[in-house]
Each structure stands twice: as structure tokens, then as C-alpha cells.
Amino acid sequence: MKNCWIVGASSGIGFELAKKLCINGYNVVASARSLENLNILKNQIEDDKKSTKDSQNCGDIMIEAVDVEDYEALKKTWQNILEKNHKIDLVIFASAIYEQMDLRDFDLELSKKIIHVNFDGFLNFLHLITPHFMQNKNGHIATIASVAGYRGLPKSLAYGASKSAMINLCEGIYPELKANNIALSIINPGFVKTRLTAKNNFPMPFLISQEQASDYIYQGLMAKKFEIHFPKKFTFILKFLRIIPYKIYLPIINNIYRKNHQK
């Protein structure tokens, strides 16, 4: 069986993805700040395994509580995982903070917190796991970004910037990882029904469930796709907006802002 470490597995997409991978034969180490939620995840996986006909082919679940902002704690967790599993085949960074924000409600400390968790946390994660994969010249690194990182969007002041930085970083390191036989996947979901998107007070077209999202991601990971984006009816619209010039893009975004965000 292959071994996987998921950081940010206590809720949302990370939670469902941990379940999906474990049922499909991965030994999963699930990490997050909330030990309580990790125990809920563990219990759900154990229950799912009992009700699965092919339970002998399911993987095991192990939980390790850790905060991605704490580099030394994250390092200790990674060392513990390697001591117990020796080799990790797949790592997934799913930690994130999301808050709607524009200039009228610009919270500097919250903005720094969003950047620190979403992007600096990924840097901490990447710095720790890369030597293991480079040494083995094998493995798979994945991270959950967002279509909000494609281009600047209203109400996404800090969150969009953090995801854009993540996408840019992954594009930059892809050639070096590929040269060392290491797969890299950047996961860009559209709107997924989670506790994060529950805060939104604007229309969310093509909203999908966490379970649907985990299915899309699992299929993409198994195919070792560089970008896993979904639902495509929505993401292709944003991909088009990504490539058009500013003189076309900005009037479109300005119109959306005036319709949905001005009070």
C-alpha cells in the first residue's frame, strides 16, 4: 500500500479526500490543528471500512495534530511520520483560511494571517517534504489552491493573492520536480460547499459538494495531472477570463462588482 500525508484534513475538502484515499487503499496520515475533528475523521473512516465489502484493501488512518504556521512543530510531525512509515508516496497541502474582504473592510492582521496560513504554511510544508522526494527521485506533491488565484477578483483581497502566489510557485518548481521524477498537482476548485464558502453572501454558480470535489481530485491525482480544476463548466469560464487583456477583463469585473458588491 502507498502512504499519504494530508495537512488540513480536519474539515472540508481535505476531510473528504482523506476518507477517499483511505478507502481506496492508501495509508493516510491526517494532520490539522483540531485533534477533535481529526478523531471524528478517524472514526468515520473506521466506520466506512467496516461497511465496505473490500475492507481488506482499505488503508489505515493515523492522525497527527499540528499547526502549519509552526515550522518546528510541523518538522517534528514530519519526522515522526517518516520514522513510522519510512517512505511517503503522496503529500497534500489542504490547509486554508478564507474571508471575504475588500478595501472598505480591509483587516490588515487578518490579511496577514490568511497569507501566513495559505502561502507561508505551504512554504513550510514544501521545505520539509521536498528533500525526501528529491532523495528518492519519486513521489507526488499536491496542493489545493483555487480558481480565485487565476486573476484578481472583488472581495478576494488577501485570499486570492495567497492562492495566486501558490499557483505561480507550483508553475516555477514543476520542471525541477519533473526532472527528478516527482509529480506535482495544483488543485483549483470552483465553489465547493464547505464551512469556508458558507460565509459567502453572493451567488456561487455551479456549487458542488465536498464529496463531488474529492471525486474530481482523486481522479486527477491518480492520473497525475498537473492541474486539477473543477467543475469545468465554471473553471473554463475563468480560464477564458485569465487570458483576455485588461481592456476587456477589467470592464467585466467592474460590472460584476457594481451588480453584486456595492451597497
Q: Can you name each region flagged by the protein language model?
A:
Residues 186, 202-237:
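C-terminal helical subdomain
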Residues 94-99:
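Conserved NAD(P)H cofactor-binding loop of Rossmann-fold oxidoreductase domains
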Residues 146:
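Residue(s) in the substrate-gating loop at a strand-loop-helix junction
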Residues 102-103, 110-115:
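Substrate-binding pocket helix/loop in short-chain dehydrogenase/reductase
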Residues 10-11:
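Conserved glycine-rich cofactor-binding loop
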Residues 24-41:
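Conserved glycine-rich Rossmann-like NAD(P)H-binding loop of the short-chain dehydrogenase/reductase
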Residues 126, 162:
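Active-site helix of classical SDR
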